[in-house]
Amino acid sequence: MPSPGRREATEMGKPTGFMEYGRRNNLTAPPLERIKSFDEFHPRLSQEEREKQGARCMNCGIPFCQSAMKLNGAVSGCPLHNLIPEWNDEIFRKNPEQALARLLKTSSFPEFTGRVCPALCEAACSCGLYSDPVTIRDNELYIIENGFEKGLIKPRIPEIRSGKRVAVVGSGPSGLACADMLNRRGHSVTVFESSDRPGGLLMYGIPNMKLDKKIVLRRIKLMEDEGVGFVTGCRVDGEKAKELTSEYDAVVLCCGSGTPRDLKVEGRDANGVYFAVDFLKSTTKALLDGGLEDGNHISAKGKDVIIVGGGDTGNDCVGTCIRHGCRSVIQLEMMPKLPDTRSENNPWPQWPRVCKTDYGQEEAIALFGSDPRIYQTTVKKLISGEGGRLSAVITVSLEAARDEATGRTVMKEIPGTEKTHDCGLLIIAAGFTGASESVCTAFGLERDARGNLPASEGNHRTSVPKVFTAGDMRRGQSLVVWAVSEGREAAAEVDSFLMGYTDLI
């Protein structure tokens, strides 16, 4: 593994690169071609073209891209504070080892964030003020994948073990990041996962076309080679919690925000209504177990599908349903459509509040001829047919109104706007309401009003001695990059608790 070393403060290799080269994203397969499989569909650019993209980093005075600033209620810039200008320049200078070293200094799993992160960094890129931002996420992915392909990434086995044992409960991005950092410090780490495969959200919450599971398993194998243990199929109840707290020097709970938000409407008990997390997991598991041929999954084939929720998970469900062979798909969004371009009160470097058409929606447009999204609309009633099977959904339009009790703006139904849609499969992708109650109860922990484990900003220690928490379980539903950041921060706190100091950053 290359050493990050010290980098002398110098001018960027090509200060005029942003004026000479235009932005070029990784390639994208046409929608009607890529829906034929669950494979990833973004071939990478050539090395020569990638070097040009690295050269576009402009040696700006203040690299907002790595700042993670909260502006107007949203974060802009990288939560991991990646050394973005440095490794962009190393790409241009043809220094793959140094680029990799600088990237790995702050990022645990660039192969994940380089695929699924919404690129908060690019929203804050100085080039984006007047032109197109640098392809930071694609550059990140190039560095890490080039590192794997060239054999630059090898197991980093600690030379000395501390004699301390740490149990990490949950193997999603926060759990893996925490385990990786603690193992690096020489602690003996075991990760406990309730599912049949490690990876958590990365394995079963993100479809293969966005994150091939070979990529997840490659990282798990690397961590195993470095000394991290994994125990799957392990549900933590009261007895298991007692065992972990008695046998380990520290326990870190990284179980995510696992309680999905439900629909409270008439007919909710109809057969054919599923949460998005269960739908996506069943597809991925069936693909891994038998190539989706065994029929042991929630199928959208030949069905009229309605997806409740306009976020990334809802879009993932659209793309997955299309690959199943659904007859039609509609995606309901409660909020109004965002503008196509930035408004005057949403300037750079704020996160751009604009309408984004993601891959699943692109595929629906190409296949069915129209955007699947219906804005300012929600479900009012579910109708069952023979055998209690879902047969139709009644929707209603919404409008913004002031709640007199709270003074807040809420979405209220517009009388007389009801519509009936044929529907054989309803998928609820409305987000999550908090941490798993069963795990919290097992450790004697109470959730706060938001359903999360209470912990102050920058503090991952719970009210139970030697039990810590990180990721969505602590901060609520969020992004993979935030989960990784949380895991790294929690690892430093646990290390300090165990050793009296820490050199983890």
Please provide the spans of the model-predicted regions.
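Feature captures the FAD/FMN-dependent oxidoreductase FAD-binding
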Residues: 98, 160, 165-169, 217-265, ...
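Glycine-rich dinucleotide-binding loop and its adjacent helix/turn
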Residues: 142-160, 218-238, 260-324, 448-463
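Beta1-alpha1 glycine-rich phosphate/pyrophosphate-binding loop at the start
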Residues: 19-25, 31-43, 55, 79-91, ...
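Glycine/serine-rich phosphate-binding loop and adjoining beta1-alpha1 elements at the start
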Residues: 51-55, 59-67, 73-158, 224, ...
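Glycine-rich Rossmann-fold phosphate-binding loop(s) that bind the pyrophosphate
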Residues: 170-173, 309-311, 472
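FAD-site-proximal beta/loop scaffold in flavoenzymes
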Residues: 269-302, 401-477
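Conserved hydrophobic helix-helix packing surfaces used for dimerization/oligomerization
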Residues: 166-168, 189, 305, 467
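A conserved FAD-binding loop/helix module that cradles the flavin
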Residues: 314-317, 324, 473-504
